[in-house]
Structures are given as structure tokens and as C-alpha cells.
């Protein structure tokens, strides 16, 4: 009912991305994770339209002559991180937050505020969900789905999410 916007990789910043690269011995993965975080946080928390980020990725791929995001290397993600942070600054007039606690508070606030979004109101009306109920925030550690070709993530429901049947 709050529409379940997701922000992955919260806590990454210019400093922690280096630690993640060192810990995993995979700079490309770390930089890709950081740019994903900037994109999700920029969209969900800061209100930057997603197409601004997607357009940049597509332009990078065109310039390199590749089709897939997985064909971009660590240097490409470095460039995109800088460009993504510039988009955030241009659209919000603020620097992308480097303080992990401010990132967390921003994400939590965005989830609570999503309850009053037009999309959530329409969904609640269509599904007869009372507006007095409110929404919850889940903060959890997760595995990475973008660490390599043998990594993935998924969602499992124990009940039908549409009607609640077993």
C-alpha cells in the first residue's frame, strides 16, 4: 500500500565503495552497486526522474558500442557515478549524501511519505484498503544479485499477493 519502493545498497558512499571493492576484490561490482544505489536513492528519496539516469547509461553503452550493462567496466561505472551525482546535484541543488545515517533517515522518510503518493492512494482505493492503516519500513541486510554471472536475487511469496490464498 505504500507501493514498496526499494533502495538497495544503502550505506555506500565515496569511501565505503572503496572498502567494498577491496573486500570483494571486485571494483567493477562495487562501482556498479554504488551507481545502482545513487540511482535508486536519487529517484525514490530525492525525486529525480529515473529516465535521467537511464539515458546516461544508454549513452555510455552507445559510445562504447555495447548492448548490456554487464559489458561496462569499472572505469565506465566510475564515470557514471560522477555523472549520476551531477544529475542529483543539478536536479535537487544538493550534493548526494555521503553520511550513511542521513541516507538511512532519508530512505525511511521516503517510505513513510510514499503512503500518501497518488499511486498508493489509487491502489488503496481499488483494493479497499483503509487509508488509516499506514505503512511500515523494513531495513534488512541482503545478498548481492549483481556480483557475477552466477548471482541472482528473487522474491518469494508464501501466499498469493493478490488475494491472500494459500
Where are these regions (language model features)?
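Nucleotide/phosphate-binding sheet-loop regions of phosphoryl- and nucleotidyl-transfer enzymes
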Residues: 1-166
